[in-house]
Amino acid sequence: MMKAVTVETGKPETARLEDVPDPDPRDGSVLVEAVAVGVCGTDVEIVEGKYGWPPPGRERLVLGHESLGRVVDPGSAGGLRKGNLVVGIVRRPDPVPCPNCAVGEWDMCRNGQYTERGIKQIDGFMSERWRIEPEYAMKVDPALGILGVLLEPTTVVAKAWEQVVAIGQRAFWEPRSVLVTGAGPIGLLAALVAMQRGLDVHVLDRVASGPKPDLVRALGATYHTGAVGRIGFEPDVIVECTGVGQIIADSIQAIGAGGILCLTGVGSGGQATGLATADIAAAMVLRNNTVVGSVNANKRHWYKAGEALARADRSWLSGLVTRRERPERFASALKREPDDIKVVIQFAEA
């Protein structure tokens, strides 16, 4: 038996740390000891009963999709050795499969029958041990240590930039400026990757002080508060990381001609006001602007995310992990504190 954080999906206030059976070898030949699991808004929604699906025939789901672990037994995985740090790819292709899943593009699944660790029909990583198929285990640079837990959220950014570049190259395209809306983990990682691409980076968030503006400025980027329309320039690219309806609407109006607005998530930010459908059409049609949604991630995005983290300053990355909690305090980890950026549940030392 082992300890795991589980929840009865669809029912709030049912999350608990409990004893569960050791992972079944049928779940994968690679046995991993958990080091840390990142907490994000999706986990909170699942615990609140708003999202999530348990494995078939079960009522409870093991939480956690932002993983980091150490290989205990590599099994048949030729590229892994005992002691390697790894993270687990989250999404699995649908069983049909659809045309995209059939060629490894499961992030672009067309029929919605994909599954996801810790979210949809497969147990997650918030347990003392977990198993995984070798092809879904991503080796982590040991120099990252516990910061390897940032790999999964970085895949969100890697996929988003891939989409932005693909759209931009439909015509002559030399982007100079990018606005990132939201300075949470995804937004800060988006700013990091934009800086690595040599762009003039601006980040907008509602807080005026604390670790978020400090981290933005430490990157060499510009920090803004207030409305999107008051930043003083028209960005070539906006990476939207809040999911707030009004910010999305304002971003459509604020982006420069030929610009690209990439939406990286959904939220409960209410309805936008003051923007009619005709205004959206005018902004997009007359100025050749594009709005694209992006959900992570297939295998190449995990590799790209690893490359981005390997290039990043370790001390800056460390600033993203603002709180570490033990598994016994998972409930505290799920409750947001004012200066939180990335909270992790730590099972062991990296």
Place the predicted regions along the sequence by residue.
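C-terminal hydrophobic helical "lid"/dimerization subdomain
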Residues: 2, 249, 299-350
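Glycine-rich beta-strand-centered segment in the early N-terminal region that forms part
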Residues: 23-37, 52-99, 141-143
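Residue-level marker of beta-strand positions
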Residues: 66, 84-85, 100, 129, ...
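Mid-domain Rossmann-like dinucleotide-binding core that forms the NAD(H)/NADP(H) cofactor-binding site
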Residues: 83, 144-228
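NAD(P)H dinucleotide-binding glycine-rich loop of Rossmann-like/cofactor-binding domains
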Residues: 95-178
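Glycine-rich cofactor phosphate-binding loops and adjacent beta1-alpha1 units
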Residues: 167-174, 217-289
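Residues in the short beta-alpha loop(s) of Rossmann-like NAD(P)-binding domains
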Residues: 205-209, 267, 297
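C-terminal substrate-binding/catalytic core of Rossmann-like NAD(P)-dependent dehydrogenases/reductases
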Residues: 271-321
